[in-house]
Amino acid sequence: MSKKVTNIVEELVTPILADMDLELVDIEYVKEGKNWFLRVFIDSDNGVDIEQCGMVSEKLSEKLDEVDPIPHNYFLEVSSPGAERPLKKPKDFTKAIGKNVYIKTYEPIEGEKEFEGELIGFDGTTVSVTVKDKTRKKTIDIPYEKVASARLAVIFF
């Protein structure tokens, strides 16, 4: 059910975002405790502000009321993805080159399944990350199809 809902919401929100020069980052439809939440994460090259989130929320809410794909009460939340934005699509990896990332893989690569470091390259099939290995830095090449999840990482000094 949640996959079906997110697909419908994606179809509804995409034209709204295109009209506002915004992009869809992610959609979550989850139950937390007794409540259901429909979360839509949006962004643009210049970031998003609360007014844009509010406008998208209003327009999407109208569309959801028309189509009514969710049979029970839920909370609609529209927001930016935040500082640790998920990297979901190939273009997200390309835009993140030069930034710090955190990547989990489906299976170990060089004995590890988690990597944190600077994303230095992405060619569509391989994600290259420079990570610290004890006292030195080394580059790890991760096949894109082995990436289970990835996000920007905030590094505190």
UniProtKB/Swiss-Prot annotation:
Subcellular location, record wording:
Cytoplasm
For this UniProt entry, which segments traverse the membrane? none
GO cellular component terms?
Answer: cytosol
Family listed: Belongs to the RimP family.
Q: Which UniProt keywords apply?
A: Cytoplasm, Ribosome biogenesis
Protein name per Swiss-Prot or TrEMBL: Ribosome maturation factor RimP
UniProt cross-references to SUPFAM superfamilies, sorted A to Z? YhbC-like, C-terminal domain, YhbC-like, N-terminal domain
The protein's matches in HAMAP family, at most eight in alphabetical order, are given as: RimP
Tree of life domain: Bacteria
Which source organism?
Answer: Geobacillus sp. (strain WCH70)
On whether Transferase is a keyword of this UniProt record, the answer is no
Any idea what job this protein has?
Required for maturation of 30S ribosomal subunits.
Instruction: Indicate where this protein is primarily found.
Output: cytoplasm
Cytoplasm: is it a keyword of this entry?
yes
Query: Pfam families recorded for this chain?
Result: DUF150_C, RimP_N
| PANTHER family (alphabetical) | RIBOSOME MATURATION FACTOR RIMP
